[in-house]
């Protein structure tokens, strides 16, 4: 038997020394959000940290970790003083529960969003679509880790190769950083609004800028404020430079991307100096980012989320009350009556705090510089087209008088240092001259058919706007049934799914464009994005050739902004309205008269010398020619695809209603089957029963669905022929055999020449003249 070893004396087990750390100096890591989650709410942007305990000492939350922990650098650690309360190590040997790794939406790069299948009738269906694998978050942790003192590191702004941009250098004294970025982005010369706005804005005066859609308004106000960011880079105590408000989240993210692209060398060391603060993303992360030194010097925000941040932290009110520039992008939408009351509250909070600073001699003697930009500044444009009221006669002698009236309206809502300088680069018309408008007349129940006809006859990248979300969902399924790639975006979708749809649409459009460029003889297909008016303002989607108004918009300003999604950056595009006879007598007439008002004024002034009569509103938009023989061949396909779309949407809706009812009954301990009779007899549920019966009538049994799909696929496999020609390919006015051999003519319609909506409208205009 061996002897027991005696315990050694004098040795004591020492616990690792603990320290209290600041939460803003921890190396937080983003967590990955799996695609299996349909809606993760406000947890997008969630971040985690391991090896840190949370203690509440005297009612104050503190973060405690071991001295040898790797959660932050040694230089950032603070030792616990002798007079501080010792913290027990409660971590013990218990293994930490594994957390699901999600990836922050803010950190998803372009191209990483999944390219899913095209069929998606509802937002919930999109969550189940198989998506491509995301990159391993461990590979790019360093890109998102919030390192310390990143804003205090020096950057050599002059270490940039010189460029030759005479039109930009003659415009204003721009830094080499911006000139180099403009050169890299191939912005070789400024647009008209940029030429007139940038020098005036850099003088510090208030500006109201009006320009047509796609004319470069973002850089018109973006370049001056980025110049301030670059000039203030070496200062230690940096106050906020600019607050930019946009009406939609998508526009806020787009403006953020544009500003970051023109100051990439600065953001390489100060990546959070330009921040986007919008709803739908984690407010906790946004609060933490704002606590970092010199972060958020330029903030692009939606009013709702920014007001929420101000009310949660009063120090932000004092901080942003010292801002130099206040910018309203799409200002007409922000300041409409009944919209965005949050913006008025924000201005009130900042003004009260700024006046306090002025009394204490902490702030400047004047208020911030105010810049407002939009494509539409007219009170008439906000009138509802569906209203039965007559259009008010608000004719002005000239465009300047009208804008002065608009300024008086705006000054009642926001504050200026003085009367703003008016810069109007589009006084002659409200719709961009690069947009060719057209009208498609159709029966009220055949909008789908005429929309399908347009996409078949004029393939390309198309954006379709609907007034109702239900129409967006149905049209998406309808076009997918016909083999046309279609994506959807509307206000009921979460922010993640909106961005996914936009990314997929851009990827599919770029893919089809590459195929057509490399092989001109390949079959050209349409790529379609179907949207509600959430995508009508400000979004810069490259390569959109056509805009279709499935429904006439509710007001004229919405029509202008919808149409402005095409013909951007100097290109031309087509805007087509699908209109029924009932609409042509009311909303269409009011729309065209409102748009023709300004032109008619200038025409009236010129008619005194030329003796020409003003153009009637009926003649301001040409009809798109419709070939009835091709339309008749598409009719049966359209009918089958529409019935299948109604069945799919109704079935999904009924399934969700049943699941919700069963879940609620289980939680309450109620037998659903026994209460169905009582529910059916209740007068209060009559509307619900009628709605359910309508959905039931649209459903089809499985056997009939299979038969209809087989019939539809068979019809889609049969090529469309012009004039229904089935025999004698070498006869007639067009030699079909020769066109087939030489791969000439329309890709989808045999015997038809290649068509282009833009060229078709131009030719028709020449014939009319």
Curated annotation (Swiss-Prot):
Keywords: ATP-binding, Helicase, Hydrolase, Nucleotide-binding, Nucleus, Phosphoprotein, Ribosome biogenesis, RNA-binding, rRNA processing. GO terms for cellular component: cytosol; nucleolus. This is ATP-dependent RNA helicase MAK5. The modification Phosphoserine is found at residues 138, 674. Belongs to the DEAD box helicase family. DDX24/MAK5 subfamily. ATP-binding RNA helicase involved in the biogenesis of 60S ribosomal subunits and is required for the normal formation of 25S and 5.8S rRNAs. Signal peptide: none annotated. Residues 73-99, 114-140 are annotated as: Disordered. It comes from the Eukaryota. It catalyses: ATP + H2O = ADP + phosphate + H(+). Pfam families: DEAD, Helicase_C. GO terms for molecular function: ATP binding; ATP hydrolysis activity; RNA binding; RNA helicase activity. A motif (Q motif) lies at residues 167-195. The gene is MAK5. GO terms for biological process: rRNA processing.
């Amino acid at each position: 038997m061996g002897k027991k070893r005696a315990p050694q004396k004098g040795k004591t087990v020492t616990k690792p020394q603990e320290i209290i750390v600041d939460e803003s100096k921890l190396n937080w890591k983003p967590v990955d959000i799996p695609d299996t989650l349909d809606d993760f709410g406000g947890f997008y942007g969630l971040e985690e940290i391991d090896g840190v305990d949370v203690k509440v000492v005297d009612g104050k939350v503190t973060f405690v970790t071991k001295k040898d922990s790797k959660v932050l650098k040694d230089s950032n650690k603070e030792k616990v003083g002798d007079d501080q309360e010792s913290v027990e190590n409660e971590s013990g040997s218990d293994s930490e529960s594994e957390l699901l790794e999600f990836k922050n939406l803010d950190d998803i790069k372009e191209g990483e969003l999944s390219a899913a299948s095209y069929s998606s009738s509802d937002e919930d269906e999109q969550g189940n679509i198989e998506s491509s694998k995301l990159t391993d978050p461990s590979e790019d942790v360093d890109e998102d880790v919030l390192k310390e003192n990143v804003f205090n590191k020096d950057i050599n702004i002059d270490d940039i190769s010189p460029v030759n941009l005479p039109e930009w250098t003659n415009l204003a004294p721009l830094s080499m950083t911006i000139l180099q970025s403009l050169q890299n982005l191939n912005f070789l010369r400024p647009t008209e609004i940029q030429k007139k706005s940038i020098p005036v804005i850099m003088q510090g005066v208030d500006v109201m800028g009006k320009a047509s859609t796609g004319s470069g308004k973002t850089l018109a106000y973006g370049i001056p404020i980025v110049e301030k960011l670059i000039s203030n880079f070496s200062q230690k105590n940096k106050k906020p430079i600019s607050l930019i408000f946009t009406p939609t989240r998508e526009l806020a993210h787009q403006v953020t991307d544009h500003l970051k692209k023109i100051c990439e060398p600065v953001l390489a060391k100060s990546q959070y100096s330009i921040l986007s603060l919008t709803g739908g993303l984690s407010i906790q992360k946004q609060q933490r980012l704002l606590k970092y030194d010199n972060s958020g010097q330029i903030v692009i925000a939606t009013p709702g989320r920014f007001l929420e941040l101000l009310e949660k932290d009063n120090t932000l009110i004092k901080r942003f009350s010292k801002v130099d520039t206040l910018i309203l992008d799409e200002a007409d939408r922000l300041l409409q009556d009944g919209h965005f009351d949050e913006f008025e509250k924000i201005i009130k909070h900042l003004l009260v705090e700024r006046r306090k600073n002025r009394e204490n001699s902490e702030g400047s003697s004047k208020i911030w510089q105010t810049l407002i930009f939009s494509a539409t500044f007219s009170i008439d444009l906000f009138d509802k087209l569906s209203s039965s009221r007559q259009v008010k006669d608000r004719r002005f002698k000239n465009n300047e008088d009208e804008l002065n009236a608009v300024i008086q309206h705006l000054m009642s809502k926001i504050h200026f240092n003085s009367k703003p300088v008016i810069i109007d680069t589009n006084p002659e018309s409200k719709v961009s001259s690069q947009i060719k408008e057209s009208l498609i007349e159709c029966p009220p129940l055949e909008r789908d058919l005429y929309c399908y006809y347009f996409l078949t006859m004029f393939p390309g990248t198309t954006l379709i706007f609907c007034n109702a979300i239900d129409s967006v969902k149905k049209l998406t399924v309808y076009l997918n049934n016909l083999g046309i790639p279609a994506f959807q975006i509307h206000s009921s979708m979460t922010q993640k799914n909106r961005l996914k749809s936009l990314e997929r649409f851009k990827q599919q459009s770029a893919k089809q464009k590459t195929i057509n460029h490399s092989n001109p003889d390949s079959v050209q297909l349409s790529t379609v994005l179907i949207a509600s008016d959430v995508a009508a303002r400000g979004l810069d989607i490259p390569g959109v050739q056509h805009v279709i108004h499935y429904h006439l918009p509710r007001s004229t300003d919405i029509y202008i902004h919808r149409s402005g999604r095409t013909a951007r950056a100097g290109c031309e595009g087509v805007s087509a309205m699908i209109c029924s006879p009932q609409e042509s007598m009311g909303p269409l007439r009011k729309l065209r008269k409102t748009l023709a008002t300004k032109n008619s004024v200038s025409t009236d002034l010129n008619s005194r010398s030329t003796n020409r009569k003003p153009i009637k509103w009926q003649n301001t938009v040409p009809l798109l020619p419709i070939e009835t023989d091709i339309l008749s061949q598409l009719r049966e396909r359209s009918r089958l695809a529409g019935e299948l779309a109604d069945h799919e949407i109704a079935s999904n809706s009924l399934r969700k209603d049943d699941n919700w009812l069963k879940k609620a009954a289980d939680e309450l301990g109620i037998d659903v089957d026994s209460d169905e009779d009582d529910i059916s007899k209740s007068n209060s549920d009559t509307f619900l029963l009628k709605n359910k019966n309508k959905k039931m009538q649209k459903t089809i049994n499985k056997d009939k669905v299979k038969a209809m799909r087989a019939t539809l696929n068979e019809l889609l496999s049969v090529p469309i022929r012009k004039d229904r020609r089935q025999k004698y390919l070498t006869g007639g006015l067009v030699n079909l055999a020769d066109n087939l051999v030489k791969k000439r003519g329309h890709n989808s319609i045999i015997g038809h020449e290649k068509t282009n909506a833009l060229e078709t409208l131009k030719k028709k205009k020449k014939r009319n003249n």
